[in-house]
């Protein structure tokens, strides 16, 4: 049995911190998802980004729930899992992580489209129906599920196995070593996907920052520097997306650094625990970014609380 996990589930501080992070993330994403469902049921006017925001909260919620279940095999002495459970859980977890990346990228691009002026070539996409967004998300989902399909073959249950030839994921689940050709092919596909989506995020973020800076200069020129113009809903939404994308890129860099160090030191439980914690910060914090920065969400939640208190 691998030493790092046996040491991890005996450390109550690491275990409690990790499950506290998961609990906070599940609660926040559930709240944001329920708000979007409530908004849809009440027939309120939806924005172009409402569907991706609701979908992102659902994906993060499912990923965190899946993480909590998988973590029982990492931090808690648990009965053994068979191949089917290992393959299903880890494949779904990796799929949800990929979908979170795809949806975040789509959200960034859509917000750039919303903020674009009428003279921009992106303005024609503002009034596209929501089923175009659904098709884009579905296409990205199918593509990523195909890229991750090798996990259904390479993930196996490894009870009472101590060899270092396997990449241990949890106490009972490991990844079989692949041939150099297969490993290179899937690594290249994943690298192309990540570089493309993150580059698209960076470009759309840079475009939004440029538009916001230009708008601020124009507003100051028209109203004078003594006045502080009130931010429009589109600008507030853009700032929340910018915060979200900055957090995502930062967490991706940290995850890459920790993952590289874990590759160098396979039996180091400290780097493994850091990776477990860091990789889920984005899914935990992202709903708070929307809840805090979007005034209509805060006002709606406040009115709902008042109604509940008056019942």
UniProtKB/Swiss-Prot annotation:
Span of the signal peptide: none
GO annotation, cellular component aspect: plasma membrane
Keyword Coiled coil: no
Keyword Nucleotide-binding attributed: no
SUPFAM superfamilies linked: Family A G protein-coupled receptor-like
Cytoplasmic side: 39-50, 116-135, 210-239, 293-311
GO molecular function: pheromone receptor activity
Family stated for the protein in its record: Belongs to the G-protein coupled receptor 1 family.
Protein name: Vomeronasal type-1 receptor 105
Organism: Rattus norvegicus
């Amino acid at each position: 049995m691998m030493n790092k996990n046996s040491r991890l589930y005996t450390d109550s501080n690491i275990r409690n911190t990790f499950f506290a992070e998961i609990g906070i993330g599940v609660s926040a994403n559930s709240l944001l998802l329920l708000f979007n469902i409530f908004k849809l049921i009440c027939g309120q006017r939806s924005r172009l980004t409402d569907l991706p925001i609701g979908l992102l909260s659902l994906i993060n919620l499912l990923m965190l729930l899946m993480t909590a279940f998988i973590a029982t095999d990492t931090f808690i002495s648990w009965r053994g899992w068979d191949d089917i459970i290992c393959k299903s859980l880890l494949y779904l977890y990796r799929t949800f992580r990929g979908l979170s990346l795809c949806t975040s990228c789509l959200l960034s691009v859509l917000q750039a489209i919303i903020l674009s002026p009428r003279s921009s070539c992106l303005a024609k996409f503002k009034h596209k129906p929501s089923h175009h967004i659904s098709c884009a998300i579905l296409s990205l989902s199918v593509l990523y599920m195909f890229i991750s399909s090798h996990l259904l073959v390479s993930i196996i249950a490894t009870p009472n196995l101590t060899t270092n030839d396997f990449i241990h994921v949890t106490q009972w689940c490991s990844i079989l070593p692949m041939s150099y050709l297969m490993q290179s092919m899937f690594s290249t596909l994943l690298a192309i996907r990540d570089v493309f989506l993150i580059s698209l995020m960076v470009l759309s973020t840079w475009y939004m920052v440029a538009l916001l800076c230009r708008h601020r200069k124009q507003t100051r020129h028209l109203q004078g520097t003594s006045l502080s113009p009130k931010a429009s809903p589109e600008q507030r939404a853009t700032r929340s997306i910018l915060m979200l994308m900055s957090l995502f890129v930062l967490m991706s860099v940290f995850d890459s650094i920790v993952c590289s160090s874990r590759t160098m030191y396979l039996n180091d439980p400290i780097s493994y625990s850091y990776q477990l914690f860091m990789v889920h910060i984005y899914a935990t914090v992202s709903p708070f970014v929307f809840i805090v920065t979007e005034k209509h969400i805060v006002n709606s939640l406040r009115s709902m609380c008042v109604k509940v208190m008056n019942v």
